């Protein structure tokens, strides 16, 4: 997330799609109409695959594979003061890499739904996390940005779609 915002700040990108842990006061933004669910990606043959969903307390003691951004932003809020039983064995920047680690049996990857293939033949599956906030998504751009005509057209389309 930080890399994307840096590129936006330097003018290398016109727009970015980000989650709710960006300082929205720094940018103009449009909230997207969809929200994503957090969950656990694991091997399809894992004994815990029988569970339909997980709570944060279910994660304590499990070998967790987490997004680097999640560890920095959401992690402290979810576990509050109970950090002693949390076992993060790896972090990832790309969801695909987290899924590969989970498929290899390294642990349980925490990620948003629909970021990786969890269909029947994939070898992994997704189980939702209960009682955690959904991830809200935003289209952001620099304040006082002067757009090219095509970027201006895209902004107009985005505004019409999300309002």
At which residue positions do the language-model features occur?
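Hydrophobic hinge/microswitch elements
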Residues: 1-13, 18-19, 70-125
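Secondary-structure junction motif
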Residues: 62-84, 147-151, 155
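Short helix-loop capping/hinge motifs at secondary-structure junctions, enriched
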Residues: 45-55, 131-133, 144-150
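Flexible hinge/capping segments at coil-to-helix
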Residues: 27-38, 42-64
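Beta-alpha-beta core module
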Residues: 25-31, 35-37, 97-145
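Generic preference for hydrophobic
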Residues: 17, 29, 40, 64, ...
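Extended ligand-binding regions for polar small-molecule ligands
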Residues: 57-58, 140-163
């Amino acid at each position: 997330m930080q890399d994307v915002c840096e590129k936006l700040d330097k003018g290398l990108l016109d727009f970015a799609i980000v989650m709710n842990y960006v300082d929205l006061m720094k940018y103009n933004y449009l909230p997207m109409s969809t929200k994503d669910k957090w969950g656990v990606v694991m091997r399809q043959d894992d004994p815990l695959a029988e569970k339909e969903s997980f709570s944060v307390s279910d994660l304590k003691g499990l070998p967790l594979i987490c997004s680097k951004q999640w560890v920095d932003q959401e992690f402290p809020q979810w576990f509050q003061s109970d950090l002693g039983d949390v076992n993060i064995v790896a972090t990832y920047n790309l969801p695909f890499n987290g899924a590969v680690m989970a498929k290899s049996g390294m642990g349980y990857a925490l990620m948003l739904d629909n970021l990786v293939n969890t269909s029947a033949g994939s070898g992994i599956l997704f189980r939702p996390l209960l009682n955690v906030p959904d991830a809200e998504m935003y289209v952001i751009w620099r304040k006082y940005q002067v757009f090219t005509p095509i970027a201006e057209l895209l902004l107009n389309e985005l505004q019409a779609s999300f309002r």
